[in-house]
A protein has these predicted regions:
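Flexible, solvent-exposed loop/hinge segments and secondary-structure transition points
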Residues: 1-197
Length: 197
C-alpha cells in the first residue's frame, strides 16, 4: 500500500513538473507582452523609444519604471508601477506621466477586488477620470476625503487604494527627477543627474 501511494505521488510530481516546464516560458512571455502593452497604453503618443525597465528606491521600497523618448531623444514620459493594497489585496497599477508630471493614463495589471464592486477599478468609467490629471494642481484623493476623484460606488476602500497608488506614483516620479529636469527643456537621464550631484 505504501509503495503504491509513493508511486502515485512520484508520477503526479513528475507530471506537475513537466507541465510547469512546458508552461513557464509561455506564461512569462505573456506577462512580458502584457507589461509592454500596458507601458505603451499609459505613455504619451509621442513616445517612440521606451527605455528598459529600471528601479528607483523611494521611502524604503523599490519601484519599477520606464522612461520614454520622442524621435529627437527628448524625454516625453515615464511609466511607473505601484501596488497599493485594496480590499482584496494588492492592486498592481501602471501609471503613465508626461514630461510635466501630468497623468496620461493608468492601467491595472492585476487585482483581486470584489467582482461587481471594487473590480470596477479596471473599467473606463473609473479610470478615465485620471487622464490629464495634474497631481500638482488637483487633490489626488476621493471626494469623500476632500479630493477631486469620483469614487466607485460602494467601493471606497478600493477607490482610496487606487488614488493613494497614483499619489505615490506621482511622488516616485518626482523622486526619479523628471519634473525639475524637464522643466528646463533639457532631457537628462536620471543616472546622469546622480553622477553630477
Amino acid at each position: 500500500m505504501t509503495i503504491c501511494l509513493l508511486a502515485i505521488c512520484l508520477v503526479c510530481s513528475g507530471l506537475l513538473a513537466g507541465v510547469y516546464a512546458l508552461t513557464a516560458e509561455p506564461i512569462a512571455a505573456a506577462a512580458a507582452a502584457k507589461n509592454e502593452a500596458a507601458i505603451k497604453e499609459v505613455l504619451p503618443e509621442t513616445a517612440v523609444t521606451i527605455e528598459e525597465e529600471r528601479t528607483v528606491d523611494y521611502e524604503g521600497a523599490s519601484y519599477a519604471y520606464n522612461l520614454a523618448y520622442d524621435e529627437q531623444g527628448n524625454t516625453v514620459g515615464c511609466a511607473i508601477n505601484v501596488s497599493p493594497v485594496g480590499f482584496g489585496g494588492p492592486i498592481v497599477i501602471k501609471v503613465g506621466f508626461d514630461a510635466n508630471g501630468v497623468i496620461c493614463n493608468t492601467k491595472v495589471l492585476s487585482q483581486a477586488e470584489t467582482p461587481g464592486l471594487g473590480a470596477k477599478c479596471v473599467e473606463p468609467a473609473f479610470s478615465e477620470q485620471f487622464k490629464g490629471f495634474d497631481p500638482s494642481q488637483k487633490n489626488l484623493a476621493v471626494k469623500k476625503d476632500g479630493g477631486d476623484v469620483d469614487a466607485i460606488t460602494a467601493s471606497t476602500i478600493t477607490s482610496r487604494a487606487y488614488t493613494d497608488g497614483l499619489a505615490l506614483a506621482a511622488k516616485v516620479f518626482q523622486a526619479i527627477g523628471q519634473t525639475p529636469i524637464l522643466l528646463n527643456d533639457t532631457p537628462v537621464i536620471p543616472s546622469e543627474v546622480e553622477e553630477s550631484k
